[in-house]
Amino acid sequence: KATIAAAKTRYPDRRLVICFQPHTYSRSSYLLDKFISCFEGIDKLLILDTFPARETEADGLSAKELLARLEIKDTSHVDSVSEAIDHVVNLLEPGDVFIGVGAGDVTDVPWGVLPRLQNLAWESLAVQKEELNPNN
């Protein structure tokens, strides 16, 4: 909640995109009410599969079940870090604020998104340069 509040304070007019990975099924179940309120104010939420640690899905709430109970308009479930990276790269628009939070390998998502966006920017510049100088 504090991270989202800080991002909204710092970037009040920007779209806020969050990728979240719950930590354990039992914790997702136990903290459901807090999860519902902590994501208020975001524009897009992606939820990765729960980082299970020592648990099985029978121990509580899965990421898909958590997603179904959240009252956020624009949400998506992704099965893997690579799927999350692809989804975020296709979703982000100039000026968006993107944050990955949670347990497990969700921290790999921003690090995977950054080079992909950099490559897209370089490709765009190359196309623009070619359009400006078609004889080179």
Which residue ranges define each predicted feature?
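ATP-dependent carboxylate-amine ligase
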Residues: K1-N136
